[in-house]
């Protein structure tokens, strides 16, 4: 990831892609299984569907429990904002109309395989990262850059794991 100098109010975006030798339907089964994200992530520790639902659909909510060495532990509530099998799965953290973060998987057929993209947007609503920014406003661009780089690294790991699982399942 290259330095951008972006600040939180810019709502910066980061994405990663991978080509998977498996059909979109098989990849969809993995990316839409929210418990798998907790298994793959070093930060997301546990995910639980709320309101008695057991799977993804627009409007369904889930809790995410997170831990980070520099930021401690916290819990978020996310809402599924897009659920279009086997093409797009997205959720907003916090208020879906004004989220603290947005995440999305996009699946595109590529021959007999799938091009999978994971995408993240910071903000526009405040998040736990704002505690560090408020404490060191002169370092905001660096704080944002480091956090975005962490997300990019995590995405690359997630995509590699999803690729491995999807290809082994075939």
Q: Where would I find each of the regions flagged by the language model?
A:
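Glycine-rich portal/gate segments that line the openings of hydrophobic small-molecule binding cavities
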Residues: 48-102, 110-112, 153-170
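Beta-strand/loop substructures that line and gate deep hydrophobic ligand-binding cavities in soluble
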Residues: 95-153, 162-164
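Hydrophobic beta-strand positions in extracellular immunoglobulin-like domains
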Residues: 20, 66, 120-122
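Conserved beta-strand segments that form the floor/walls of ligand-binding pockets within enzyme
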Residues: 13, 19, 79, 90, ...
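Hydrophobic ligand-binding cavity/cleft-lining segments
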Residues: 1-54
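Short amphipathic alpha-helical segments
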Residues: 23-26, 150, 154
């Amino acid at each position: 990831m290259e330095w951008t100098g972006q600040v939180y109010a810019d709502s910066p975006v980061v994405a990663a892609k991978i080509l998977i030798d498996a059909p979109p339907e098989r990849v969809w089964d993995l990316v839409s299984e929210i418990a798998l994200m907790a298994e793959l992530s070093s930060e997301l520790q546990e995910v639980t569907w709320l309101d008695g639902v057991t799977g993804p659909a627009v409007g369904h909510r889930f809790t995410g429990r997170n831990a980070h060495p520099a930021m401690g532990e916290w819990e978020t509530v996310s809402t599924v904002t897009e659920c279009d099998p086997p093409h797009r799965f997205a959720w907003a953290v916090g208020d879906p109309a004004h989220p603290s973060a947005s995440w999305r998987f996009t699946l595109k057929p590529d021959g007999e395989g799938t091009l999978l993209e994971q995408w993240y947007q910071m903000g526009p609503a405040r998040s736990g990262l704002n505690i560090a920014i408020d404490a060191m406003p002169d370092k905001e661009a660096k704080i944002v850059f480091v956090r975005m780089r962490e997300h990019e690294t995590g995405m690359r790991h997630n995509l590699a794991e999803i690729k491995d699982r999807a290809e082994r399942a075939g």
